[in-house]
Amino acid sequence: MTEKKQSISAIREIFAAASETELPALYLEYEEDSRAGVQNLIQKYQKQEEALKKERERTEQMKIYEHKYEDLGWICGIDEVGRGPLAGPVVAGAVILPRDSKILHLNDSKQLTAKKRDELYDVIMREAVAVGIGYASPARIDEINILQATYEAMREAISKLSVKPDVLLNDAVKIPQVDIRQVPIIKGDAKSVSIAAASMVAKVTRDRLMEEYDKVLPGYGFASNKGYGSAEHIAALKEIGPSPIHRQSFIGHFV
């Protein structure tokens, strides 16, 4: 009497419960099982492993600056979100990651889905050594201009860190009035995990804030356009006029 084969659903559960180090042994154990469902399952996990390997390699490439300056002490990534919108604040993030950070999928926040950004935000907030967030209001942007307001938000983010950094990795800019060594990196959120993490924190923070504004200031579509000049937003601006969070210095062409 032949031994009854395990069901494919049972094998699927075994694979799902296996750790990464246990998978190679499972491939060997089931490689002779000719059922299409089993072979497809093996191929699925092998593809996932290959994708994970590539992501780890990509992430390691994004640690070049972190490795270069690690002997100097704590390294902090700085980035901002919201320089271009017609409404809402500019938000800056400052993040110090652990030296042995294993966080994957960090990248320019605009390249990721909202769901993935939310997931990464939670991981960063849980695992980071320190996180600081700074804001510059629409009124402040109008008062001192967007560039100076961005610098102000960045300085606030740095000041809110619970650990003082020794090196700042900045996305492209050099922040005035900061007595910490700065390394400006063009397109830094795609080249440094620290800057990418700061970008993620700033982006998610600002997006959530604009979604809250949409509830109290309906009609402009803030939840979807996040204050940027979409057709819907501009039409509403012309029809109902500016809200308290519009940047007067940005909307002259529309009102």
Kindly give the residue locations of the regions a language model identified.
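RNase H-like, Mg2+-dependent phosphodiesterase core
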Residues: 1-76, 83-255
